[in-house]
């Protein structure tokens, strides 16, 4: 049986992830896809969006399997400050790429694309996701919620590939446009990540 604080941790993680993967899928389809023009990368982005939909379903399955209050869990991004803060942090970075007037081609806009990709892949899909994964997987290592932990293992496998892909795209943009990676911009990215 879970201790009350473990149950709270599971609920908060499911509340965050059920919303976060929807944000990720929307960002991929509505924003990132139109700015990444390499055909192979675009194919991968579509695959990633498909996997995010599967993850969202897996979180819903976990919530239902555990008999948790679905409305409460799925509304945590609105009602629980710890979950809402993460979603609110990510929104400006995802919305700017989805802005129909945004176009790359200038130094400033190319840096904006690079900044938003770093925020999206390194911070949101990297740091924020991995914190939740480690918490749930730690329960599985103690033979608690082994089925949920197994679902998170599968999702972690996918998310590791997503993050690595994103970092590859970021590095390729930096290599193709070395003038974007100024000392000032580097410091901005360090501040973003920390």
Each predicted region: which residue ranges?
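Non-heme di-metal
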Residues: 1-194
